[in-house]
UniProtKB/Swiss-Prot annotation:
<protein>
    <recommendedName>
        <fullName>Large ribosomal subunit protein uL2</fullName>
    </recommendedName>
</protein>
<dbReference type="InterPro" id="IPR014722">
    <property type="entry name" value="Rib_uL2_dom2"/>
</dbReference>
<keyword id="KW-0689">Ribosomal protein</keyword>
<dbReference type="InterPro" id="IPR022671">
    <property type="entry name" value="Ribosomal_uL2_CS"/>
</dbReference>
<dbReference type="InterPro" id="IPR012340">
    <property type="entry name" value="NA-bd_OB-fold"/>
</dbReference>
<keyword id="KW-0694">RNA-binding</keyword>
<dbReference type="InterPro" id="IPR022666">
    <property type="entry name" value="Ribosomal_uL2_RNA-bd_dom"/>
</dbReference>
<feature type="compositionally biased region" description="Basic residues">
    <location>
        <begin position="270"/>
        <end position="279"/>
    </location>
</feature>
<comment type="subunit">
    <text>Part of the 50S ribosomal subunit. Forms a bridge to the 30S subunit in the 70S ribosome.</text>
</comment>
<keyword id="KW-0699">rRNA-binding</keyword>
<dbReference type="GO" id="GO:0003735">
    <property type="term" value="F:structural constituent of ribosome"/>
</dbReference>
<dbReference type="InterPro" id="IPR005880">
    <property type="entry name" value="Ribosomal_uL2_bac/org-type"/>
</dbReference>
<dbReference type="GO" id="GO:0002181">
    <property type="term" value="P:cytoplasmic translation"/>
</dbReference>
<comment type="similarity">
    <text>Belongs to the universal ribosomal protein uL2 family.</text>
</comment>
<dbReference type="InterPro" id="IPR014726">
    <property type="entry name" value="Ribosomal_uL2_dom3"/>
</dbReference>
<comment type="function">
    <text>One of the primary rRNA binding proteins. Required for association of the 30S and 50S subunits to form the 70S ribosome, for tRNA binding and peptide bond formation. It has been suggested to have peptidyltransferase activity; this is somewhat controversial. Makes several contacts with the 16S rRNA in the 70S ribosome.</text>
</comment>
<dbReference type="Pfam" id="PF00181">
    <property type="entry name" value="Ribosomal_L2"/>
</dbReference>
Amino acid sequence: MGIKKFKPVTSASRYKSVLDFKEITETEPYKPLTLTLSYKAGRGDGGKISVRHKGGRVKRKYRIIDFKRRKTNVSAVVKTLEYDPNRSAFISLICYKDGEYAYILAPDGIKVGDTVQSGAGSEIKIGNAMPIGKIPPGTNVHNVELQIGRGGQIARTAGSFGTIAGRDGEYILLKLPSTEVRKVHENCYATIGICSNKDHNLVSIGKAGRSRWLGKRPTVRGVVMNPVDHPHGGGEGRTSGGRHPVSPWGQPTKGYKTRRSARPSDKFIVQKRKRNRNR
């Protein structure tokens, strides 16, 4: 999918770019598979902000996606390729032979009229889902389960994928987009192919208003706040007090490891992800 740029007739259009959406075949979702979810705008039950920089987005319907793909040995025809405002990847409406409809994450290269299937005996073809133990090494997969039957949790965003790197007993070695190598049980399901909308990272928002449509509010630097609001606040002129950068609650940031040590899933990590030292 290509990127559309604009003539600089305004300050906003000078840097703005959008996807051309030429591959999209449907503009309205399939209503039986949609929900209306209330938007909390980053507030908890008490009405207080629990997540900053959220609020004021455009209304949207939630599309119910089948991340489990457990309807096995029944082929389905791809009916549409649709935009989903709730995620960066595109989605596809599929119709099974028995007449049931479902939304799935659209893999890159899938087209209307293609057939997809789930199950251990499925063909190694883009869009088919099967136990990861049945997929040959070197194959790119997305929507990968970490727990059997829970549904895909890894490689679900636009252009993301994992690569089958090998086998270790009943576990499959999966190389993730972050360069981490992780063990996944051979009976966990995965979908063949790369997640759609690979050009998503090339889109430039271009103006503040477009971020507001997405529900993103402005981020104020701590150094321009008062001492009561942020550890970096106060002082004459621009100064952060000479301390290492911290969050508003005093937790070190910018390089500080915040991942909890000794997590139960650590035993499945074969190789940790490489950290970007140039930040």
